[in-house]
Amino acid sequence: MCALDRRERPLNSQSVNKYILNVQNIYRNSPVPVCVRNKNRKILYANGAFIELFSREDKPLSGESYIRLQVEIFLSSLELECQALGHGSAFCRRFNFHGEIYQIRMENVSFYNDESVVLWQINPFPDYPFFALNQSGSNTNTSDKLTIWNDLSPGTLVVFSFYMLGVGHATIARELGITDRASEDRIKPVKRKIKEFFEHFDLFRVSCIYKGEIDSLLSIIREFYGVK
């Protein structure tokens, strides 16, 4: 899905080098992984966060999302799609890497000298502020109360949302591109934390349902599939 009508966006009048300098000035020290690649898929600029993200070692026995080459092939296919859409096109997609879920934004930028580049920006997905639970299980936003949702990484949060809705680990693993074991390992520490306040996990699940807190988890799932 393109964010804007490309016909309303004139070609970039600056040079490629000038554009890259502008990107570098903005993202040099940013925690957001960013890179710029040309039509031949050569990296013209990558910040430190991008280099660090894609320097992780492969884990061949942990699923495709742990193999850098597989992830790079998928992202390159998205880049080709962005190039084909032409100047001004921009879209977001989600992908899995090392068991974590990310959202990538790609934007095609073309110049008057017939050069073009694709800007990559990568963020953890999703990134929501979530409610906290106090020891009686009631909903609160007070920072000194027990937090459950707020302590979860984006990847664990999506697994937890599926699990809370009754989806089994095999299906969760298939949907997220991770192993069954990875799905189980993400849920175990959350269940241990919940057990401190609820005798059974299902009591916690029912509590979230009748208090309407389950709606937050449904919104995560809808968001997840909305950018797939």
Curated annotation (Swiss-Prot):
Q: Primary place of residence?
A: cytoplasm
* Keywords in alphabetical order: Activator, Conjugation, Cytoplasm, Plasmid, Transcription, Transcription regulation
The family database entries (InterPro entries) matched by this protein are listed as: PAS-like_dom_sf, PAS_fold, TraJ_R1
Compartment(s) of residence: Cytoplasm
Any Pfam family from its record, for instance, is PAS
> What induces or represses this gene?
Post-transcriptionally repressed by the FinOP system.
Q: Name one GO cellular component term.
A: cytoplasm
Q: List the disulfide bonds.
A: none
An example of a Gene Ontology BP annotation on this entry? regulation of DNA-templated transcription
Q: How does it assemble?
A: Interacts with GroEL.
- What is this protein's function per UniProt? Together with ArcA, is essential for positively regulating the expression of transfer genes that are involved in the conjugal transfer of DNA between bacterial cells.
Quote the protein name from its UniProt record. Protein TraJ
This protein's gene is called traJ
